[in-house]
Every structure is written in structure tokens, then in C-alpha cells.
Swiss-Prot record:
It comes from the Bacteria. Homodimer. Pfam families: ATP_bind_3 (PF01171). It catalyses: cytidine(32) in tRNA + S-sulfanyl-L-cysteinyl-[cysteine desulfurase] + AH2 + ATP = 2-thiocytidine(32) in tRNA + L-cysteinyl-[cysteine desulfurase] + A + AMP + diphosphate + H(+). A motif (PP-loop motif) lies at residues 44-49. This is tRNA-cytidine(32) 2-sulfurtransferase. Belongs to the TtcA family. Its cofactor is Mg(2+); [4Fe-4S] cluster. Keywords: 4Fe-4S, ATP-binding, Cytoplasm, Iron, Iron-sulfur, Magnesium, Metal-binding, Nucleotide-binding, RNA-binding, Transferase, tRNA processing, tRNA-binding. It is an enzyme of class 2 (transferase). It is found in: Cytoplasm. InterPro entries: Rossmann-like_a/b/a_fold, TilS/TtcA_N, tRNA_Cyd_32_2_STrfase, tRNA_thiolation_TtcA_Ctu1. Catalyzes the ATP-dependent 2-thiolation of cytidine in position 32 of tRNA, to form 2-thiocytidine (s(2)C32). The sulfur atoms are provided by the cysteine/cysteine desulfurase (IscS) system.
Length: 284
């Protein structure tokens, strides 16, 4: 990163403080990192994971708890992948790291029918490999670089195409119960992350496997949300607040709320009211 002066320096410092504050708040709000944790930071070479690692390294130096960071990149053997970029960067910033080599690219290309997107299979293979490696190195937390917009996009993808009301939680336990996944950038705006990555001059590596695929459902949803935000500034922030303020009794999921038991609750409520009136009457 070149030296900044004047207004540029002020703008960068303001942005950096905002991102650090948001990451710190997310970590505290959801108990993402505790004393003694070993956090495996999944580094893809994109703007989000670079920003996540950069901010976590700063927090590590200033946090009231001691935790370990180790950066891990999964080399999926995509054609043209610049294998030297991440090791050189990680050596320069001085963080412990591993490069895990798995030819998931060939598997994805072989198994995905022509014209279909590779995202789902690629994601499953990548997740399985990273979870396994986290266990191998003794990492009890796996940090992913998803941000606020990723979470909102996933919410609408599941609503529109999956028939379910769910998103990406800031913190979750994996299905096998072995790994806790955290998303420290949960409160961060994608635009802020992109600007920060540009200021910091991270050596961005584009994804040649999925990033260029046309008509991705996620891209359609992203464009929809972008248009909403342009027409109604602040709408995405309001929508994000909504997923942190869920009222199960106002939805229709019988597993989340006991609708059949409302009559019992009504009887109990009326009985308590009658009892209260009787007490007041006796006191009078």
C-alpha cells in the first residue's frame, strides 16, 4: 500500500475504523472468537477474504483475548491460477499459512452438466476439504469472508428458489458437529470492503471457474438488491436488521411456534387475569 496524504489518508482511516468496529461488534455480539481459539481463515484471493484476514490480524494485536490465526488457501487446480501470489503475500504480512492442493476443478467440470452452474458442487467440495483440513491442524473455528450483502442475497435465493426462509448465520455449528463456522464480516457492506481492498492494494485473484458464468441466480438477486438500494438508500440496512429481529409468532412455521397450543395459553392468560381481579377486589 502506497503512502496516503491529506484527504485520502482521512478517508482511508475513517473506512478502516468503520470496518474494524463492525467486525469487532460482530465478534462480540455472536461470541465468534474466545480466548485460546485457533481460527482458520479461509483465503480465496478475493477482496472479501483479504479484508477479513487483514482486520482479524489487527484485532489479534489489540483484542483482550489471545487467539491464533492461520490462513488457508484451497488450490483447486483451476487453469491459470497464479500459485505464487498468495504465498508471497502471506510471507510478506507474516501470518502462518497452508496451501491445500486438491483438484476439485476437474471433478466439478466432469460432474456438472453442460449449461449448468458449477457453484453448488464446487461449494460442497470446497467446504468438505476445508473442514477436513481444519480438523487436521486443530483449528476449532473456521472463518469465512461472507459480508452483509452475501447474507441478504442468500436469504432471497432461498425464498425465491428454495422455498425456505433462511440465510447465512454469522456463526454456526457444522452438520457433523465438529466445526464452528464464523463470518466476521457479517455487519460489513460490500462496497466498503471493495473500497478497502482497493486502498490496501491486495493482489486479487479472480475466480475463473464460477465468476464468469452468465445468468447466475445469485447475480440476478444481487442486481435486484443493488437496484433497490439505489432507488431507496438504506433499504439493505433495514433488511439486514430484519433478519436479526425475527418474530416466529408472526410467520407460519409450526416447528418454530406452537400455534396449536394458543388455546391453552389463552386459558392460562384469562385465568391469571381473573385471579388478579379477585386479588384486587379483596384488597379493595
Amino acid at each position: 500500500m502506497h503512502e496516503l496524504t491529506g484527504k485520502d489518508k482521512l478517508a482511508f482511516n475513517k473506512l478502516q475504523k468503520r470496518l474494524r468496529r463492525q467486525v469487532g461488534n460482530a465478534i462480540v455480539d455472536y461470541g465468534m472468537i474466545r480466548d485460546g481459539d485457533k481460527v482458520m481463515v479461509c483465503l480465496s484471493g478475493g477482496k472479501d477474504s483479504y479484508t477479513m484476514l487483514d482486520i482479524l490480524m489487527n484485532l489479534q494485536r489489540n483484542a483482550p483475548v489471545a487467539f491464533e490465526l492461520v490462513a488457508v488457501n484451497l488450490d483447486q487446480k483451476q487453469p491459470g491460477f497464479p500459485e505464487h501470489v498468495l504465498p508471497e503475500y502471506l510471507e510478506r504480512v507474516g501470518v502462518p499459512y497452508h496451501i491445500v492442493e486438491r483438484d476439485t476443478y476437474s471433478v466439478v467440470k466432469e460432474k456438472t452438466p453442460e449449461g449448468k452452474t458449477t457453484c453448488a458442487l464446487c461449494s460442497r467440495l470446497r467446504r468438505g476439504t476445508l473442514y477436513g483440513f481444519a480438523e487436521e491442524i486443530g483449528a476449532n473455528k473456521v472463518a469465512l469472508g461472507h459480508h452483509r450483502e452475501d447474507m441478504l442475497e442468500t436469504l432471497f435465493l432461498n425464498m425465491f428458489f428454495g422455498g425456505s426462509l433462511k440465510s447465512m448465520p454469522p456463526k454456526l455449528l457444522s452438520d457433523d458437529g465438529k466445526h464452528i463456522v464464523i463470518r466476521p464480516l457479517a455487519y460489513c457492506r460490500e462496497a466498503d470492503i471493495a473500497e478497502y481492498a482497493e486502498w490496501r492494494e491486495f493482489p486479487i485473484i479472480p475466480c475463473n471457474l464460477c465468476g464468469s458464468q452468465p445468468n447466475l441466480q445469485r447475480q440476478v438477486v444481487k442486481e435486484m438488491l443493488t437496484e433497490w438500494e439505489e432507488k431507496h438508500p438504506g433499504r439493505l440496512e433495514t433488511m439486514f436488521k430484519a433478519i436479526t429481529n425475527v418474530a416466529p409468532s408472526q410467520l407460519a412455521d409450526r416447528a418454530m411456534f406452537d400455534f396449536e397450543g394458543l388455546e391453552d395459553k389463552q386459558r392460562d392468560f384469562l385465568a391469571r387475569r381473573i385471579e388478579t381481579f379477585d386479588v384486587l377486589a379483596r384488597e379493595a
